Amino acid sequence: MSKPIQMERGVKYRDADKMALIPVKNVVTERQELLRKPEWLKIKLPTDSSRIQGIKAAMRKNGLHSVCEEASCPNLSECFNHGTATFMILGAICTRRCPFCDVAHGRPVTPDANEPEKLAQTIQDMGLRYVVITSVDRDDLRDGGAQHFADCISAIRAKNPTIKIETLVPDFRGRMDRALDILTATPPDVFNHNLENVPRVYRQVRPGANYDWSLKLLERFKEAHPDIPTKSGLMVGLGETNAEIVEVMHDLRRHGVTMLTLGQYLQPSRHHLPVQRYVSPAEFDEMKAEAMAMGFTHAACGPFVRSSYHADLQAKGMEVK
């Protein structure tokens, strides 16, 4: 077992170093080690990677980050090749250490005051019409980073007046009132916050987070902006059951959420939580049917679905899986 480390500000800690401080340890069993990816999870890489390299170059030029890269998303090649990306603001170091996530943990540096302007210019240069903005958790900031989100939204709209903006926000733990005061004054076009999984496994999957708190965040934003869609996503394969997923879907509807994403959890490294099961495309189709019957206006359900995967198509109600 790794020993706890003394964190230095601005240093990214990953894998064993990141997991050393998690209270619920990941003990991999022989059965879990033998669990193999099914054929439907094999990814075909594009033959032409020039668009991918172009987006990466634009990010590096302006000192920006994408969650696609930082979280090792399996859809990176597809999304970058189609000219889309999910921008991650407030740095690339998270104050949380969720054992399903590949984003680095540590003591983050002070937010870049020029990031909103650089982000807006990059989006204009890329000619994007729909953009997703997310962030690491910033428990070190008094507002959890809410003002930085608002500054980014304002800067993007100033340079790109017709663009649609979706924000995928953290839970603003202990700062909900302050954060919502800011975000309701400068709202996005879609407000997204992921529950990630079912409440029974929260202590293991989302240490430091609270299921009811996350539901309340979604509900309160919706109450302030009834006409703005709220959205949430879950991963399957972390020990939950399909029945528990359906119950979470009911909870989301009871809290006013109308957009849903369901995707397969994939283990980033052997130090992360192991995959407990692989859910078939047919099961995802069944969950989508249940979601639509509950009253969700949009439900993207499939093995490769992530909360920002083809988010522009999701917002239009087009089929995504």
UniProtKB/Swiss-Prot annotation:
Gene3D superfamilies: Aldolase class I (3.20.20.70). It is an enzyme of class 2 (transferase). Pathway: Protein modification; protein lipoylation via endogenous pathway; protein N(6)-(lipoyl)lysine from octanoyl-[acyl-carrier-protein]: step 2/2. SMART domains: Elp3 (SM00729). InterPro entries: Aldolase_TIM, Elp3/MiaA/NifB-like_rSAM, LIAS_N, Lipoyl_synth, rSAM. [4Fe-4S] cluster 1 binds at C68, C73, C79, S308. Binds 2 [4Fe-4S] clusters per subunit. One cluster is coordinated with 3 cysteines and an exchangeable S-adenosyl-L-methionine. It catalyses: [[Fe-S] cluster scaffold protein carrying a second [4Fe-4S](2+) cluster] + N(6)-octanoyl-L-lysyl-[protein] + 2 oxidized [2Fe-2S]-[ferredoxin] + 2 S-adenosyl-L-methionine + 4 H(+) = [[Fe-S] cluster scaffold protein] + N(6)-[(R)-dihydrolipoyl]-L-lysyl-[protein] + 4 Fe(3+) + 2 hydrogen sulfide + 2 5'-deoxyadenosine + 2 L-methionine + 2 reduced [2Fe-2S]-[ferredoxin]. Belongs to the radical SAM superfamily. Lipoyl synthase family. This is Lipoyl synthase. It comes from Yersinia pestis. The gene is lipA.
